[in-house]
Amino acid sequence: MKKVLVNQVGFLCNAPKKAVLNFQANEFSVVDGNGKKAFDGKVEHFGTDEISGEDTYVADFSALTEEGKYKIVADGQESVLFSISNDAYDKLMKDICKCFYYLRCGDALSKEFAGEYYHKPCHMTKATVYGEDVEPVDVTGGWHDAGDYGRYSTAGAVAVAHLLYGVRFFKGLLDVHYDIPKVAGDKGNLPEILAEVKVELDFLMKMQRENGSVWHKVTTFNHAPFLMPEDDREELFLFSVSSLATADIAAVFALAYTVYKEYDAEYADKLMQKSLLAYKWLLDNPDELLFFNPDGSNTGQYDEAEDISNRFWAACALYEATSDGKYYSDAQELKNRLEEFDKNAQKKGYQGNVFTCLGWAEVAGLGSLSLLLKREENALCSLARNSFVAEADRLVKVSKENGFGLCMGENDFIWGSNMELLKYMMVLSTAIRIDNKPEYKLALEAGLDYILGCNSMDISYVTGNGEKAFKNPHLRPTAVDDIEEPWPGLVSGGPNSGLHDERAQTLRGKGLPPMKCYIDHIDCYSLNEITIYWNSPLVFALSGILE
């Protein structure tokens, strides 16, 4: 089928702008809502690329800067209607930020703030410490992690980190207003994004034991069936502590200290004390303590290959927050260990430079972000700068290998491929601040175009944003709330050539290219689930685009 593929939300006035055609055409026009021509241009033939399987043609209309609603027309085919405006992404930004409110655990979502997506309080019982004969623990609050109702320390810490680094790097994020209720402990001066992040920080504090270690997760023993959160009344379990969770919490509390001290010194000091307590536990327990589910449990495992990157992040975050040289020394030693691991690893869960990895499974790049914020002339800060520039250069090279200008290779289309892209967009938006190369911006904007519909599925991977936005996330509350549309702003996991779930496996044997390994179906947890740490990198990257 002939398609004109375009960012379905739109473009900023002075941003690069393109559409991709999967059919031959020589010329194209941009017309307004009344059919009046606003721009004519020549189509450039790129050719076939491995990730889309399409013979692609590119229509560049970057020269059109006048605000308005437009369509692309070529060879009798039309795109969806999109906007050109400096406000083009205002709704998108509000939606992706407010999703964290909709994912709150414990709190009732009121009609005043959640509208038709309201629900009663959930998961208010104390949690049993699995395998220990101790009193149950109150760990209420925080955010539901994903399509399930679990709450996971490492995942939550990384999502919070994306948001707080977004605040540190791009001040505009503090000015995003999206109507959420006042949170406990807010003295009335917290910007909305920091009020929402406080919800998760308060929960993560409860996940820390008195000795500083941190429970890896709190979930039911197995995933709940598809029901509303308030109807999930199975016993909650706190599963064992891990050095992964403890290091991530040490890091994110130190980062949070640097932000919240401007608004609430007492709260910030509490975060720092808990960060130091976690870090002391790490020093007292130098051997890695990884995490694996007990037999019979199927909730998220969030296992990692090593804890070196987590400890590195913690040391870097504490050094940035305190300027204490002992953390620099620790980070230097951990850097050496991580380089050795990276050199010898038989199987890596990441592409590119380990010091720019920004996801829950490999967090060294988060440590690098703290070093970039330090802005010092020393070996580690130079490593961070050089790593981000080198990785951005790699991504630009990859982006030139397909007609979409997308900085993803065939191996990036894994479970949560959209997060892979969004992490790369974080790298590019950070690298722009180090070395403002035009090609970084092109690759960054092309990534956003892909997420918002300029892809061979012709679908926007953000609910409620774009004419053909996906509508069937693997998400319990939206599956059973009897409301036709899911709440807006959710980011889909996206195409996954592994096709890991039963519904996705119906695509096997069809010889599909990676970009087309996708179904918008509620059963497709390996293609169409959502999670807090798929929204958070988009918040960071979009903040960079809007800066």
Swiss-Prot record:
It comes from the Bacteria. Glycoside hydrolase that rapidly hydrolyzes short-chain cellodextrins to yield either cellobiose or cellobiose and glucose as end products; cellobiose is not hydrolyzed further. Also shows limited activity against endoglucanase specific substrates (carboxymethylcellulose (CMC), lichenan, laminarin and xylan). The active site is at D148 (nucleophile), H474, D520, E529. Belongs to the glycosyl hydrolase 9 (cellulase E) family. It catalyses: Endohydrolysis of (1->4)-beta-D-glucosidic linkages in cellulose, lichenin and cereal beta-D-glucans. One of its GO terms (biological process) is cellulose catabolic process. PROSITE patterns: GH9_1, GH9_2, GH9_3. This is Cellodextrinase. The keyword Hydrolase applies. One of its GO terms (cellular component) is extracellular region. Keywords: Carbohydrate metabolism, Cellulose degradation, Glycosidase, Hydrolase, Polysaccharide degradation, Secreted. Its EC number is 3.2.1.4. Its main location: secreted. One of its GO terms (molecular function) is cellulase activity. SUPFAM superfamilies: E set domains, Six-hairpin glycosidases. It is found in: Secreted. It comes from Butyrivibrio fibrisolvens. Is not inhibited by methylcellulose.
